[in-house]
C-alpha cells in the first residue's frame, strides 16, 4: 500500500525544533511529561497483551559489536547505522539499528538448548540515519513480538492475530492490514533475469511503492516489455480474494510463484475464518524494506497517518546467518505513530489522577505522613508546603491545585476543630482531561474516610 512521507512528529508532546540551531539533533525526540506518561502506558498495555499470548519480554543492549551483528543486517542498513569506537577494545560499535537482528543473534548464540517454539517480546529504541528531506525519524520507539521455531500456518496467523488484538486492546478503532508474500514479487524479478544489483534496487523501489524508479530500473536492466509489465502490474495488485486469481495469471504456473500464492491464500483464508476479513487487504507488491524477510509479510495502516504504524513477517533464514537455522516470524509497532493514531480518535487516554496535599510549613511532618499514607493506597501524591495559614490556606491550596491541573486537593491545618479532619477541594475534569476553571467543590472529612473512599473508587475502577 502506498504511503506518503510523514512530517516530523510533534503530537507526542515533543519539543519543536527552532531552526538549524536546534538543541536536539534532527530526527530525535524529547517527549514531555504528559505525553511520556501516555507513551509508557501504551507500551505497557501492548506488552501486557503480548504476555497474555505467552510472549515473555527480553531486554537487549543498546550497543552491539559491528562485526557480530553485521551478518543479520543488509548493507544499506549498516550504512545508515550510527557507529562509534569502543574505547576499551577499539572495536566498532553499532547503536541499535534493528531489534529483530539482535534477537536472531541472541537466540543463535546465547540461548542454546532453549525449548522451541520461543515467544519473545520487547520494547526498544532503534536508531537509523535518514536524510533530512525524507522526513522520517532517526529515533524510533518500538514494541514488538517474535515467534521463533515455528514455520506452520498457525504461526503466521498467530503473529498477525496478536498484532490485531493488541491494536484493538489499546483502543485503535479502525485500521487495515496489508498482507503479502515476498516470494511472489521476488520470483517475478528472478524470472525477469535482473542482475544481483538490479534485483536489489528493484526490491528497494518495490518496498517504497516507487513506480517511476522501478520502471527506470527495469529499463536499465533491459527487461522485456512483457516481464516488466508483469512486475509493474504485480505492484498494483491490492484488494480482496480476487487478487489471488490475478496473481496466478501472472505466475504462469511457475512453482516458486504458485507456492508463494498458495501460502498467502491459506493464511488469508484462515484469518478470514476467524472474523478478520474486514481488516485484511491482499497486496502482491507488499515488500518490506529488510532483506531477511522471505515469506508472509504485512503492514498496518490507519486513517490520518501517512505511513505504516508497524509491520513484520516471516524470516526463516535470518537466525541461520548467526549459525542456527530456525524458522521465525514477528512484528514491530512504532509507538510514536500508534500514539498519533490514537490521538486522532481520543486525546484523553486514561492516566491515574494525582492528589495534591497542601499544608502550612509548620505541619511538614504531618504533610509527609499523610502523603505516605495515600501512596500506600496506590495513589499518586504531590505534596506542597505553603506559608499561608487559616482561611488563606484554603485559597492558596485551591490556586495550587488549579496551577498544577490536579482535580483533588487535600488541605491540612485549615483551622478545623479536629486535626484528624481535612478540607477536600475537587474540580470536575473537562473533556480534554484538564480541570480548567470548572466549579470548585469543598468538603470537610476525616482522613480515614477520605482514604476509604479512594480505596472504594480504585476497586470499582478495576
Where are these regions (language model features)?
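Short, solvent-exposed helix-helix connector turns and helix-capping sites enriched
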Residues: 181, 209-210, 239-240
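Short, conserved phosphate-binding/catalytic loop or strand-edge motifs used
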Residues: 137-143, 179-187
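Short Asp/Glu-rich motifs
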Residues: 69-70, 186, 208, 338, ...
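Phosphate-rich ligand and nucleic-acid binding surfaces
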Residues: 30, 190-195
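Positively charged, Gly/Ser-enriched RNA/tRNA-binding surfaces
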Residues: 2, 35, 41-53, 64-65, ...
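TRNA-binding/sensing appendages of the translation machinery
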Residues: 1-101, 157, 161, 176-178
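Short, surface-exposed recognition loops or helix-turn segments adjacent to catalytic cores
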Residues: 174-185, 202, 280-287
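Acidic, His- and aromatic-enriched active-site or binding-groove loops in soluble protein domains
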Residues: 80-88, 193-218, 276
